[in-house]
A protein has these predicted regions:
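Short acidic/polar hinge/loop motifs at secondary-structure boundaries
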Residues: 8-12, 55-56, 63-90, 433
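Extracytoplasmic beta-strand/coil segments of soluble accessory domains associated
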Residues: 11-63
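Short strand-turn segments of transmembrane beta-barrel domains in outer membranes
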Residues: 105, 109-140, 150-151, 156-163
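Transmembrane beta-strands of outer-membrane beta-barrel pores
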Residues: 124-128, 142-144, 153-157, 190-194, ...
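Membrane-embedded beta-barrel scaffold of Gram-negative outer-membrane proteins
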Residues: 144-145, 227, 231-245, 292-293, ...
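Repeated loop/turn-to-beta-strand initiation elements of outer-membrane beta-barrel proteins
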Residues: 144-148, 181-186, 225-231, 278-281, ...
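Gram-negative outer-membrane beta-barrel transporters
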Residues: 323-326, 415-419, 438-494
């Protein structure tokens, strides 16, 4: 188990090709001076300064998690206290998950007690700069009933003046297995963080403060049979943001504060069935509704609204997997996605897997990814543009993996080529003054990723990974070379 409060540092070390930014001892923040930008293979990293992550999708139990107005993930909301494990798909996954899954997908699978009993864990840590992190978790399993309750409090003064960060929140999940084949569960997560941004050393800020509340709740009914399984689920995410954009030395304090309320709700259904030997067919449908309101609240009582907008997405998809021979599997899928502003997008994907002797496998895949423009890009703040079209890319990938020595040794190598268009960037307005969001950017990336791990015994293991990335049009927060190596020790309570 990780002692980090956020899942991002763990992914930074263990996933080749993934990179996220950070700014201090603890916390990422939002808006001006924020970090927590994420990229996979150079997708998701901002093409220009001050743009958020929008090309990489974060999920919790398969449900998309992003700010309803801005369309970007909130890094401080993805805490290890709720995570049983984190699944990462490198490369486009839009055929299953839709918009934003261009560079890949991070899926946080929430905790659940698997065996009967009661387990309680308390973690307390302290460090320099007045840093404290605490977490308490209680998990129960009694017959068909299960529950998980977690609370945490973390704070730091920061390594610079005016860089304090404080966060507290809780997570609860209840589940009940009606039968061996049907189960239901629901959960809720609420976190509150207060952050301060001091600006850069050369360009400091005064009173650049944030008070952010994020919440999510979901409900799912699942079925699991020998030849079919599926789920019907509902989720609702919300956020309340209060931001003082601050001022620079010699300037005047702002006479207003930025406020926003955003929401995202959705209903998802899928069913997977084995029609005959070596076959798996999955069909599914999604409905998403997202949006909110943003305004500047002035001290004299009046307010100026910058956005009050909601949009909808409806999609259906199918994925077909078939063993053609003992050594060959075909996987093909397609999604039709309708957005209430930008219209319909068709997303195909196809792949082949070659099963070789000695637990070796070669995979070849071609997949399309896309991202719809956000409400911020279309309707909020100059240079907004309501005529924007979706960003699109194609990813071509070849991979090799193998497990040896009773699975104690594992290694893999991926090579990929990505080509995309319609990247949304700010350029001079061709029909007027100022800047305008336009579909003028291009993506052409290629690279390689390698990973290796070895389990000496139940106590000791080692792992390493490396990624190389070439970008014809470089973006921020996407390093060319990334290397990690680690030694793991786990025994009893240690």
């Amino acid at each position: 188990a990780s002692q980090q409060t956020s899942v991002l540092p763990v992914l930074n070390s263990q996933v080749p090709g993934f990179f996220s930014t950070s700014r201090g001892v603890m916390g990422y923040g939002v808006a001006t001076g924020a970090s927590g930008q994420m990229s996979l293979r150079g997708i998701g990293g901002p093409a220009q300064a001050a743009l958020p992550t929008t090309g990489l999708l974060v999920l919790i139990d398969g449900h998309p998690q992003y700010m309803g107005l801005m369309g970007h993930p909130i890094a401080d909301a993805y805490q290890t206290m709720m995570a049983e494990r984190v699944e990462v798909l490198r490369g486009p996954a839009s055929v299953l998950y839709g918009s934003n899954a261009m560079g890949g997908v991070i899926n946080i699978v929430t905790r659940k007690m698997q065996e009967d009993g009661i387990r309680t864990n308390i973690n307390i840590g302290a460090g320099s700069y007045g840093s404290i992190q605490t977490e308490a978790t209680n998990r129960i399993r009694k017959g068909r009933f299960s529950s998980t309750v977690t609370a945490s409090y973390n704070r730091t003064d920061g390594h610079r003046a005016d860089m304090a960060f404080e966060q507290y929140g809780g997570y609860a999940k209840l589940g009940y297995d009606f039968t061996d084949n049907w189960k239901v569960w629901g959960d809720v997560n609420v976190t509150r963080f207060n952050a301060t941004n001091p600006g850069s050393v050369m360009k400091p800020y005064i009173d650049n403060d944030q008070r952010i509340t994020r919440g999510m709740t979901s409900f799912a009914l699942e079925n699991h049979y020998e030849k079919t399984s599926g789920a019907l689920s509902f989720f609702y995410n919300w956020g309340d943001h209060w931001i003082n954009d601050g001022y620079q030395p010699g300037g005047e304090p702002l006479q207003y504060r930025f406020n926003s309320n955003d929401q995202m709700l959705g209903v998802s259904w899928y069913q997977s069935v084995q029609l005959f030997q070596g076959n798996r067919l999955t069909v599914g449908a999604d409905y998403f509704h997202f949006g909110g309101e943003a305004w500047n609240q002035f001290f004299d009582g009046h307010r100026e609204t910058s956005a009050n907008k909601s949009l909808n997405e409806v999609a259906g998809y199918v994925d077909f997997r078939q063993d053609i021979a003992a050594w060959l599997t075909l996987d093909a899928g397609a999604r039709v996605d309708y957005h209430s502003q930008t219209g319909t997008e068709f997303i195909p994907q196809v792949g082949l897997a070659f099963h070789l002797p000695e637990n070796a496998e070669i995979k070849a895949m071609a997949s399309k990814g896309f991202r719809n423009p956000t409400i911020r890009e279309m309707y909020m703040f100059p240079p907004q543009n309501p005529d924007l079209k979706p960003e699109k890319l194609w990813n071509y990938e070849l991979s090799f993996s193998q497990r040896l020595m009773d699975n104690r040794l594992s290694y893999g190598l991926n090579v990929f080529y990505i080509n995309g268009e319609n990247l949304i960037i700010r350029l001079p307005n061709p029909n007027g003054s100022g800047m305008l969001n336009q579909n003028s950017g291009e993506i052409e990336n290629w690279g390689a990723e390698a990973n290796v791990g070895y389990q000496f015994n139940p106590v000791w293991s080692v792992m390493a990974n490396y990624s190389w990335l070439h970008m014809e049009n470089p973006v921020l927060a996407s390093p060319e070379h990334k290397l990690y190596g680690g030694v793991n020790f786990r025994k009893g309570r240690w």
